[in-house]
């Protein structure tokens, strides 16, 4: 745990030439370096081997699905996931001595990254009226303060129960049970913030607000569009699925304002060709559009589909599905 406050880490950013491939051996070394900096080698190994396994724990790094049991890799996670899970499993601890040393005004000037790197809390802390430091507080008093706030509301619906999307299933179940017993279903989470609009639109157009395909569907798709997102950054395990698509003869079209290294070439870190070979080119085509140009692109594609359907009725559009 560092005792000196560090400010915005963006001050240390360096601009380097763009990469032309992603993952490979560097992803393995970076993940292990970070993980071993958080906890012991034994704890690191036990944690990593349990990620996304049938009797293990879900990786909190992203929402990319796991293959069916029996088809999963022993290491069913990416560099981001390894860092993420060991960030949660860290052995670092923030004690009352830390808060005695650092005033709230000091901590306010620290970066989020630095604050997170100090470790996990060991007991409840409170800021007293007029106080300059967080102070330790007993659990009974802490729960009493929360109860007093809830009792002071005119209606249960004035309360909102928002927690991290990284919360485990058991804790999430208890939270929603508590909120409903209190009298409200105001239980938003990060999925509302990320996918409320897409879920609403998909419900109106497709009848369901979430994806309806399986990983096997992606593996055997003839064509996959990757639009407006960077799988190498957002959910790198998608690259292994796209690699499988390519090896089964499918094509991938990337639509974005900037090319991403992961969609240019993917070096699978659990395969020899990924560690010592050239890896697999992912995107067959890169459609370079301006920011906000995706709507115009799909309007043009829809027009071409309609023209092709007019030229050969019944051979382009799935009328039964529509």
Give names to the regions the model predicted.
Residues 158-220:
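Anionic-ligand anchoring segments at beta-strand to alpha-helix junctions in alpha/beta enzyme folds, i.e.
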Residues 170, 213-264:
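A conserved hydrophobic secondary-structure block that centers on an alpha-helix together
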Residues 171-178, 199-203, 236-239, 263-269, ...:
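Short acidic, glycine/serine/threonine-rich loops at helix termini
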Residues 120-131, 196-199, 220-222, 281:
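Gly-rich Lys/Arg/Thr-decorated short loops/hinges at beta-loop-alpha junctions or inter-strand turns
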Residues 1-65:
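Intrinsically disordered, low-structural-confidence terminal and linker regions
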Residues 59, 84-136, 143, 156-158, ...:
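Low-complexity, highly charged intrinsically disordered N-terminal segments
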Residues 93-109, 115-116, 120, 249, ...:
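Long, well-ordered, tryptophan-enriched scaffold segments
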Residues 140-159, 213-222, 245-248:
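Glycine-rich phosphate/diphosphate-binding loops that line cofactor/substrate pockets in enzymes
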């Amino acid at each position: 745990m560092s005792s000196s406050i560090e400010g915005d880490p963006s001050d240390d950013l360096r601009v380097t030439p763009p990469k032309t491939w992603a993952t490979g051996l560097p992803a393995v070394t970076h993940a292990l370096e970070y993980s071993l900096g958080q906890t012991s080698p034994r704890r690191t190994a036990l944690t990593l081997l349990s990620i996304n396994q049938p009797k293990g724990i879900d990786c909190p790094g992203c929402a990319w699905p796991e293959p069916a049991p029996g088809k999963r890799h022993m290491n069913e996670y990416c560099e981001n996931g390894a860092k993420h899970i060991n960030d949660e499993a860290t052995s670092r601890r923030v004690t009352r001595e830390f808060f005695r040393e650092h005033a709230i005004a000091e901590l306010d000037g620290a970066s989020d990254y630095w604050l997170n790197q100090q470790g996990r809390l060991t007991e409840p802390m409170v800021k007293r009226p007029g106080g300059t430091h967080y102070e330790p507080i007993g659990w009974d008093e802490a729960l009493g303060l929360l109860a007093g706030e809830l009792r002071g509301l005119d209606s249960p619906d004035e309360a909102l129960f928002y927690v991290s999307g990284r919360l485990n299933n058991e804790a999430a179940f208890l939270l929603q049970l508590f909120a409903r017993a209190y009298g409200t279903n105001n239980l938003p989470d990060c999925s509302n913030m990320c996918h409320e609009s897409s879920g609403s639109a998909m419900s109106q157009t497709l009848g369901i607000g979430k994806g309806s395909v399986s990983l096997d569907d992606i593996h055997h798709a003839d064509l996959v569009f990757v639009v407006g997102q960077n799988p190498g950054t957002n959910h790198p395990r998608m690259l292994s699925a796209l690699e499988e698509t390519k090896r089964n003869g499918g094509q991938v079209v990337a639509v974005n304002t900037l090319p991403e290294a992961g969609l240019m070439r993917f070096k699978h870190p659990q395969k020899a060709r990924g560690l010592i070979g050239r890896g697999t080119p992912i995107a067959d085509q890169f459609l370079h559009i301006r920011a906000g140009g995706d709507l115009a692109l799909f309007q043009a594609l829809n027009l071409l589909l309609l023209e092709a359907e007019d030229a050969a009725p019944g051979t382009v559009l799935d009328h039964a599905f529509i």
